[in-house]
């Protein structure tokens, strides 16, 4: 079998640098690391999950603040370093495994991570696709472009909309690529995710809502009445517009989470179940 060429094949690495096959960029700025932990606002009552622990720069600080730290790392060399650095911290467990193959904690947990850019979307899906999980809040460092897509007021994607029905997602601040080793080609962002105390929908409706969101956001720039005409009758749509207090030109991509809740509740109350749109199954990295 012919070997597949990799973008790092033949690249000369700096001293101490490991091949970065997952898109992992390690933070080395101590003030930035302390800021991340401070903004996470964790206590000894918290179980903290760190995804992509690297050499433990963030892990060691988390170990001093949290009740329990679960540090996930797949690189064997990094795992050895992590094990040595956290040897004195009995509250810290090193999980030597692929991030996408782990089982999330059953208890309530917090995520504080500088995640590998290459698997940003799969990680977000893992954390947010099940609103009934124990995930409560997080501070996650990710590629700036992804952060902007997840937080944009104009919503184009059904997954992002569904996540934001149950979680608040916002950019805390941008981070220069100079704070990482090896430095990425683009800047990063610190993102805060918080579970909504009063979500507009029950988490049991997640799959059904995803179906509605996926159907409606096929063309996010078109008017709502056009996007949903396959679901609602003209009479139902007229009633819905009055409930939403919008005109005929309101586009689906500009609706708020609360307006989407009204649309979903109207559908479940007045539309026959067989007319409800179904969500398509996608691969973990697709969005």
From Swiss-Prot:
Induction: By erythromycin and oleandomycin. S-adenosyl-L-methionine binds at residues 25, 27, 52, 73, 98, 114. Residues 1-21 are annotated as: Disordered. The keyword Signal does not apply. Coiled coil: none annotated. Keywords: Antibiotic resistance, Methyltransferase, RNA-binding, S-adenosyl-L-methionine, Transferase. Its EC number is 2.1.1.-. It comes from the Bacteria. One of its GO terms (molecular function) is rRNA (adenine-N6,N6-)-dimethyltransferase activity. InterPro entries: KsgA/Erm (IPR001737), rRNA_Ade_diMease-like_C (IPR023165), rRNA_Ade_Mease_Trfase_CS (IPR020596), rRNA_Ade_methylase_Trfase_N (IPR020598), SAM-dependent_MTases_sf (IPR029063). PROSITE patterns: RRNA_A_DIMETH, SAM_RNA_A_N6_MT. One of its GO terms (biological process) is response to antibiotic. CDD domains: AdoMet_MTases. It holds the Pfam family RrnaAD. It is an enzyme of class 2 (transferase). The keyword S-adenosyl-L-methionine applies. Residues 1-13 have a biased composition (Basic residues). Belongs to the class I-like SAM-binding methyltransferase superfamily. rRNA adenine N(6)-methyltransferase family. Involved in erythromycin resistance. This is rRNA adenine N-6-methyltransferase. It comes from Bacillus licheniformis. The lineage of its organism: Bacteria, Bacillati, Bacillota, Bacilli, Bacillales. The gene is ermD.
């Amino acid at each position: 079998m012919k070997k597949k060429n990799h973008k790092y094949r033949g690249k000369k690495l700096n001293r101490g640098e490991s091949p970065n096959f997952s898109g992992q960029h390690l933070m080395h700025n101590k003030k930035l690391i302390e800021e991340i932990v401070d903004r996470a606002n964790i206590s000894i009552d918290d179980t903290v999950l760190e995804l992509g622990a690297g050499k433990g720069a963030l892990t060691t600080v988390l170990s001093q603040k949290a009740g329990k730290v679960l540090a996930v790392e797949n690189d064997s060399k990094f795992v050895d370093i992590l094990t040595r650095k956290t040897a004195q911290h009995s509250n810290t467990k090193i999980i030597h495994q692929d991030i996408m193959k782990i089982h999330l904690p059953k208890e309530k947990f917090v995520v504080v991570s500088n995640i590998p850019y290459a698997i940003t979307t799969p990680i977000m899906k893992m954390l947010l696709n099940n609103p009934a999980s124990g995930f409560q809040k997080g501070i996650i460092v990710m590629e700036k472009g992804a952060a902007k897509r997840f937080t944009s007021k104009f919503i184009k994607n059904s997954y992002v909309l569904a996540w934001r029905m149950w979680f608040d997602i916002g950019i805390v601040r941008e981070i220069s690529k100079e704070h990482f080793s090896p430095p990425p080609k683009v800047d990063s962002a610190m993102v805060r995710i918080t579970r909504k105390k009063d979500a507009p929908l029950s988490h049991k409706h997640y799959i059904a809502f995803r179906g509605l969101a996926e159907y409606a956001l096929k063309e996010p720039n078109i008017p709502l009445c056009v996007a949903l005409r396959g679901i609602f009758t003209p009479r139902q749509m007229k009633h819905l517009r009055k409930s939403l207090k919008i005109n005929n030109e309101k586009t689906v991509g500009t609706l708020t989470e609360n307006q989407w809740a009204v649309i979903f509740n109207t559908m479940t109350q007045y539309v026959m179940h067989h007319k409800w749109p179904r969500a398509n199954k996608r691969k973990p990295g697709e969005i």
